[in-house]
């Protein structure tokens, strides 16, 4: 029995203690780092967000894939910002529920072509999520009702 426990202990030392995850599910640090960087990435954008005056119509699909800037910057004072844009067409079905008609059409959307980390505007510190309580100058309580 002691030999078995010794063998198990040596095996754990060689392979590492099991973490409860299946091998292969842990993404390596460098991949996490590169995939989280500020860059263009496919993003689903709701059509009504880009065309808010079109609320009288339904669209199929209701959102479209476009490249948009996203990701993390090395400093909280920076934000991932588009430095290049162009227009792309996406074929959409526009449904008019009042007339009971639908038609295929091409709608234009802004797509980001380049991104970089730039200083946030003064009113945009922490993307509106400042963790400091402005009255006390200290961190905001996580559970203000406790």
UniProtKB/Swiss-Prot annotation:
Query: How is expression of this protein distributed across tissues?
Result: Expressed by the venom gland.
Q: Where in the cell is it found?
A: Secreted
Keyword set for this entry? Answer: Disulfide bond, Growth factor, Pyrrolidone carboxylic acid, Secreted, Signal, Toxin
Q: Name one GO biological process term.
A: response to hypoxia
Under the heading PROSITE patterns, the entry gives:
PDGF_1 (PS00249), PDGF_2 (PS50278)
Q: What is its main location?
A: secreted
Region annotation Disordered: residue ranges?
118-146
Where is the PTM Pyrrolidone carboxylic acid found along the chain?
A: 25
Q: Which SUPFAM superfamilies match?
A: Cystine-knot cytokines
Compositionally skewed regions (Basic and acidic residues) per UniProt: 118-139
Q: Which family does it belong to?
A: Belongs to the PDGF/VEGF growth factor family. Snake venom VEGF subfamily.
Additional observations: IC(50) to VEGF receptor-1 is 30 ng/ml and IC(50) to VEGF receptor-2 is 254 ng/ml.
Instruction: Fill in the subunit field for this protein.
Output: Homodimer; disulfide-linked. Interacts with VEGF receptor-1 (FLT1) with a high affinity, whereas it binds to VEGF receptor-2 (KDR) with a low affinity. Does not bind VEGF receptor-3 (FLT4).
Instruction: Please state what the protein is called.
Output: Snake venom vascular endothelial growth factor toxin TfsvVEGF
């Amino acid at each position: 029995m002691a030999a078995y426990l010794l063998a198990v202990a040596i095996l754990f030392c060689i392979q590492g203690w099991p973490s409860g995850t299946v091998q292969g599910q842990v993404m390596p640090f460098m991949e996490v780092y590169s995939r989280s960087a500020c860059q263009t990435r496919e993003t689903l954008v709701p059509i009504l967000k880009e065309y808010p005056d079109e609320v009288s119509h339904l669209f199929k699909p209701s959102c479209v894939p476009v490249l948009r800037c996203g990701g993390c910057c090395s400093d909280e004072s920076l934000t991932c910002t588009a430095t290049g844009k162009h227009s792309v067409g996406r074929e959409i079905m526009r449904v008019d529920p009042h007339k009971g008609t639908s038609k295929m059409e091409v709608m234009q959307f802004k797509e980001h072509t380049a991104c970089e980390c730039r200083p946030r505007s003064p009113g945009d510190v922490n993307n509106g999520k400042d963790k400091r309580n402005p009255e006390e100058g200290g961190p905001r309580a996580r559970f203000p009702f406790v």
